[in-house]
């Protein structure tokens, strides 16, 4: 442990060393008439190496911070369109350099202006999307994947330099909120001119002076896309071993200066059309309830591969989104979303549970899972954003109706499980912020209700002996916040945030036919916290530090009338939180956080009667309100050179958790009991990761490398004894994509992961190789041929047989010029791989899975 702490300390000291080598330069740029020049590019070079850059503001002033060794010979270059370039050598003592630019004397009869691929203005980096697109990039999401520093994961979530974006704008307007995949997957790439990366972004004008580490994206559309409505429409037809595949859908869009609208309707059974488009990528309302957490919907286990490989699914989705911009910073937004999904998959699993006698308890199962879900949301939002005040209110309605079925064969005994779950909710969130001279006031109020009138799980064994487990209840929640801050000095603010939270719950669980297996919970809890804090920020928004001391008072009053159990408690705790953000230049950013946080159990701890969560698993709580304390520290560093397309990020963190309750399991050949035991214990975790990428514009080539390390120590309860386990892993990988000549395109990803698990009488090491590749070639600007593959190999501990699988896909595409039509024939899983086997090692148990996969499929898509 001391070595890991020393490692973090060294990383921190390296950061301090880097800060000590920074140098400042400022000045003013004017023309020959002594008028200020804005938009002049100022660059500092050490030889041919670029150290830093910036642009002059409206008043001609510029300020630049860069890293330099004392022996460097430095040159400052000033450049602006229609002006002669100006260069000057910088001496070690220079801290200010003014420049006068002369207009260019040469006049060209005919000038062709080509926009640069990337431009910077302060904290904003603007990428010209066309410069990075490759053949076959049809949607905005395809284009975002090409931009240096931007990543898009399997779910559609967008991040920049490893940090998830906090806002997504289209022409400066937030139409979709967290469901921005509706835009990235449906806006054609040829309708987009630029992508703006807004670093240190503040969504509210009233807070624009505060430095943050948030990142946002703003999509710039072409002039034609803003003149009239446009859309994309597609239909598909295909075949797979389980039947005919189909899909049809369309998306219409309108983006005006004061009004935006996006509407989509799609239905399919191929598992791809509309997939992940309604995912919410920002943190929002939590619609789960205690009844759902006590009896979650049957889902089964899922492998570490794309769900299109192993799931059969049928999807219908509809979405209507509109935003009306009014005068004085006011706007109304309406988002209505509905989805219906049916999915299924099957697998066989061999589970090994450790026993105290040194013998494993082994259970073999064959499972077939099916799910159906209706999900609907309506959100009406008003926002008034001005320089000195913000008013925002959001009213949301939510409904979810789901069913799940599982057929499990265990020791030649057939088990049927059928579950039905209905839930609905209503939420209103109000926020008001005022800033006047040195004062800042913030008031927020959130009220939410979630009801689950029905959550029933039925069990049948060999089609007889039906029994039922139910869990239903109601949940009410309110949170009131008040923040007041006063600016003591230009750089120092004293603030006092106050928060009042209250929850009221009613929860019942009942095992049909057993009057002893009943829980009848009701109660409430309240939290009052005040967090005196100091906020320090330099005038140039280069450094910001916040130190807070949360003081919290908690009152809890719970009863389980069916178990004659009641708990009343009042607790007080004091914590601390420290955050620092340092931006020495436009290329470098440091962020450090450290905190201590207390937490306490809730009403669910009184679920002392067993709850049957599947045919062989029961869950029992201790009846004791648990307590925990978390101490954590994180340090992150990011560096970028947007003009030369270099990006680097690194992060390290440590987490320690003290808890009064240990969770674990008690296993027999027939049942698995998930339980809690009151006993103090400590868990530790260390993480570190880094990533480096480079984009070569002339070759349209992107290279990246990344690595990660993790270590953890945990305690759990198993078979009437405490077990301590230690786990560690590291991952290294690389990515390569290139479009060196217009017709040829290639991509390749390679990753290796090594895991080690010690404890509970075992010491296992196992690794995994994976790679993905794709090659495409375009002929005569109309035909496009594509071949792609996926391969994974898992090595087992003890020299056991390795487990591997391979997929091969192909596609042929033809693009018409008039009408603007595209035909695409896909041939997926050409090798007709029908099963996938892999092994998972958890903290206590071992699982050996064999999943059934979708067979070879053919799919023809027409896109307009």
Which residues does each predicted region cover?
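A short, solvent-exposed loop/turn motif at the edges and junctions
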Residues: 46-49, 73-89
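Short, acidic Ser/Thr/Gly-rich low-complexity loop/linker segments typical of extracellular
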Residues: 49-61
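Face-selective signature of the C-terminal outer-membrane beta-barrel domain
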Residues: 323-341, 370-409, 414-561, 573-576, ...
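Surface-exposed extracellular loop regions of Gram-negative outer-membrane beta-barrel proteins
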Residues: 451-453, 554-557, 586-631, 654-670, ...
């Amino acid at each position: 442990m001391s070595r890991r702490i020393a490692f973090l300390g060294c990383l921190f000291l390296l950061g301090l060393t880097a800060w000590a080598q920074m140098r400042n330069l400022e000045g003013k740029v004017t023309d020959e008439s002594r008028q200020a020049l804005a938009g002049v590019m100022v660059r500092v070079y050490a030889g041919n190496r670029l150290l830093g850059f910036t642009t002059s503001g409206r008043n001609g002033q510029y300020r630049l911070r860069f890293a330099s060794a004392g022996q460097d010979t430095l040159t400052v270059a000033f450049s602006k369109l229609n002006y002669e370039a100006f260069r000057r050598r910088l001496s070690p003592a220079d801290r200010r350099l003014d420049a006068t630019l002369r207009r260019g004397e040469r006049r060209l009869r005919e000038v062709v202006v080509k926009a640069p691929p990337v431009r910077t203005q302060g904290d904003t980096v603007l990428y010209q999307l066309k410069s990075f697109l490759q053949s076959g990039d049809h949607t905005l999401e395809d284009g975002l994947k090409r931009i240096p520093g931007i990543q898009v994961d399997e779910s559609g979530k967008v991040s920049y330099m490893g940090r998830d974006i906090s806002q997504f704008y289209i022409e400066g307007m937030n139409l979709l909120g967290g469901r921005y995949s509706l835009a990235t997957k449906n806006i054609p790439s040829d309708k987009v001119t630029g992508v703006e990366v807004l670093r240190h972004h503040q969504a509210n004008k009233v807070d624009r002076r505060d430095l943050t580490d948030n990142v946002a994206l703003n999509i710039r559309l072409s002039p034609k896309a803003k003149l009239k409505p446009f859309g994309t429409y597609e239909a598909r037809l295909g075949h797979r071993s389980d039947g005919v595949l189909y899909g049809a859908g369309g998306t219409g869009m309108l983006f005006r200066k004061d009004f935006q609208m996006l509407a989509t309707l799609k239905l399919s059974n191929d598992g791809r059309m509309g997939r992940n488009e309604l995912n919410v990528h920002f943190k929002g309302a939590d619609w789960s309830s205690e009844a759902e957490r006590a009896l979650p919907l049957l889902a089964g286990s899922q492998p570490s591969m794309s769900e299109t490989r192993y799931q059969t699914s049928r999807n219908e989705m509809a979405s209507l989104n509109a935003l009306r911009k009014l005068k004085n910073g006011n706007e109304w937004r309406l988002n209505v979303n509905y989805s219906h999904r049916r999915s299924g998959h099957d697998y066989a699993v061999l589970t090994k549970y450790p026993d105290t006698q040194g013998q494993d308890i082994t259970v073999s199962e064959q499972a077939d899972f099916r799910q159906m879900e209706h999900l609907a949301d309506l959100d009406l939002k008003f926002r008034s954003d001005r320089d000195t005040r913000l008013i925002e209110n959001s009213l949301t309605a939510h409904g979810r109706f789901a069913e799940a079925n599982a057929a499990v064969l265990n020791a030649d005994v057939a088990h049927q499980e059928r579950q039905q779950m209905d839930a609905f909710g209503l939420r209103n969130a109000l926020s008001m912020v005022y800033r006047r001279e040195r004062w800042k006031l913030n008031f927020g109020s959130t009220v939410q209700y979630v009801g689950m009138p029905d959550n029933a799980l039925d069990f049948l064994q060999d089609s007889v002996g039906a029994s039922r487990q139910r869990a239903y209840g109601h949940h009410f929640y309110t949170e009131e916040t008040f923040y007041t801050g006063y600016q003591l000095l230009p750089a120092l603010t004293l603030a006092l945030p106050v928060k009042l939270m209250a929850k009221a719950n009613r929860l019942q669980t009942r095992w049909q036919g057993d009057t002893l297996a009943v829980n009848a919970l009701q109660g409430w809890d309240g939290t009052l916290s005040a967090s005196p804090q100091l906020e320090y920020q330099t005038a140039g928004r280069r450094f910001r530090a916040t130190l807070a001391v949360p003081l919290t008072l908690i009152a809890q009053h719970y009863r389980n009338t069916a178990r004659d159990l009641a708990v009343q408690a009042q607790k007080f705790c004091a914590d601390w939180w420290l955050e620092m953000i340092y931006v020495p230049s436009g290329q470098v950013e440091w962020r450090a956080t450290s905190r201590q946080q207390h937490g306490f159990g809730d009403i669910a701890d009184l679920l002392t009667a067993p709850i049957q969560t599947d045919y062989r698993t029961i869950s029992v709580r201790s009846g004791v309100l648990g307590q925990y304390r978390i101490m954590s520290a994180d340090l992150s560093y990011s560096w970028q050179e947007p003009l030369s397309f270099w990006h680097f990020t690194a992060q390290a963190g440590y987490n320690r958790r003290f808890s009064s309750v240990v969770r674990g399991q008690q296993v027999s050949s027939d049942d698995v009991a998930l339980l809690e035991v009151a006993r103090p214990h400590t868990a530790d975790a260390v993480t570190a990761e880094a990533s480096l990428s480079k984009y070569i514009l002339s070759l349209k080539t992107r290279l990246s490398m990344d690595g990660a390390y993790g270590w953890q120590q945990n305690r759990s309860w198993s078979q009437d004894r405490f077990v301590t386990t230690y786990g560690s892993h590291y991952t290294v990988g690389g990515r390569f994509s290139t479009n060196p000549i217009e017709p040829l395109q290639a991509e390749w990803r390679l990753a290796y992961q090594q895991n080690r698990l010690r404890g509970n009488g075992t010491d296992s090491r196992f690794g995994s190789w994976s790679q993905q590749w794709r090659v495409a070639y375009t002929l005569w600007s109309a035909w496009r041929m594509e071949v792609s593959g996926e391969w994974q190999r898992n090595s087992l501990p003890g020299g056991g047989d390795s487990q591997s699988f391979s997929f091969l896909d192909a596609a042929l595409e033809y693009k018409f010029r008039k009408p603007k039509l595209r035909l695409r024939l896909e041939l997926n899983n050409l090798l007709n791989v029908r099963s996938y086997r892999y092994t998972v090692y958890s903290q206590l148990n071992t699982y050996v899975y064999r999943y059934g996969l979708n067979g070879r499929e053919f799919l023809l898509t027409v896109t307009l």
